[in-house]
Amino acid sequence: MAEKVKLIDVSKCTGCRGCQLACKQWNQQKAMQTENYGTYQNPPDLQYNTWTLIRFQEVAEKDKVKWLFRKDGCMHCTNAACVKVCPSGALHYTDFGTVAINHSVCIGCKECVSACPFNIPRYDRVTDKVYKCDLCLSRLEADLLPACAKACPTGAITFGDKAAMIKKAYARVKELGGDANVYGDKFVGGTHVIYVLQEHPKVYQELPYKPSVPFSVIVWKDILKPLSLLAAGGVVAGSFLHYILHGPKLPDEPGQGKGGE
């Protein structure tokens, strides 16, 4: 099955939050009471039941102020730190290249929360589970667009085969010129959500400049964990071999002492 990519062209985003509402509706997520912090951004951040958020950012430009809108959510990394650290296998790759959570086996350890370079997974104390966007996996399996892409009225969110979406992104950057750039296809193995940004990535809030899998995750998952499993396997294998060759260990006979007796 061909890998899929969601392309977000922020130059076309008007901040209408249609995608945010569509995500809530499709995933049957209730709204939460929030406080006004002097911004149109609401809620203030991603939550365990808010998987898509339009970030509102005011940027000074010469003698005026302009808005930057950015849809935030899971980037669905090819080399996903969350999948690497998940001890239960709850976080896994799908046939579309995206990352989903099997909540029936999630143990609420929050390792993925700490490991994610994009600060995406959110923990719910009530259910003791972690939640994030799954790119509408149930819709993809039914050959439907993700709810956010379906709802976007300006064409800022599009969805399709990976190669076609990346090609479209670079064509759009060439059309925009200036500081426009493609964000997402060059790190963590390539993400399955990519942006066309109007400004340098450093300008955008809550968007890491050069995200990567934490070194501690690499050391544990790719080096220490296999070695520990190998060592543990060696102990088990040695014990089994001893059992086969010598049988079970018998208790000492009465009167048989140990040491120098």
Q: Where are each of the predicted segments found?
A:
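Non-ligating segments of multi-cofactor redox enzymes
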Residues: 1-261
